[in-house]
């Protein structure tokens, strides 16, 4: 089973979209295995977005992510990363497919509601950074109908 980190950003939390994000991911068959509502320290934000440190928008990104609470989550399922990325839509909501989270709710590229890991390596790094060790997975009674191969 693949795991991915997902964060509802401060704009999504302020607008009451946590439930919408969770609902959409659950309807795609994914399983929520860890979650916490939290305020992000400057240190955590800078470490999370370290690969963007040299970008001109880095200071405003850190300011935004630390401006209010976020909902940090770990999701699990076959092809979880690609399913989550398709469900979120393009980073820039102007380019997001209709029916995706960002097309439906994001205001612009800076306030785009949600973050999701972009690959297995970043998922592992982000999950460890935000959660440390995540408990082993649990089984749902419906898993054998949703994922018949495994």
From Swiss-Prot:
It is found in: Cytoplasm. GO terms for cellular component: cytoplasm. Its main location: cytoplasm. The active site is at 115 (pros-phosphohistidine intermediate). InterPro entries: NDK-like_dom, NDK-like_dom_sf, Nucleoside_diP_kinase, Nucleoside_diP_kinase_AS. The keyword Repeat does not apply. Its EC number is 2.7.4.6. It holds the Pfam family NDK. It catalyses: a 2'-deoxyribonucleoside 5'-diphosphate + ATP = a 2'-deoxyribonucleoside 5'-triphosphate + ADP; a ribonucleoside 5'-diphosphate + ATP = a ribonucleoside 5'-triphosphate + ADP. Its cofactor is Mg(2+). Keywords: ATP-binding, Cytoplasm, Kinase, Magnesium, Metal-binding, Nucleotide metabolism, Nucleotide-binding, Phosphoprotein, Transferase. Homotetramer. Belongs to the NDK family. Major role in the synthesis of nucleoside triphosphates other than ATP. The ATP gamma phosphate is transferred to the NDP beta phosphate via a ping-pong mechanism, using a phosphorylated active-site intermediate. This is Nucleoside diphosphate kinase. It comes from Symbiobacterium thermophilum (strain DSM 24528 / JCM 14929 / IAM 14863 / T).
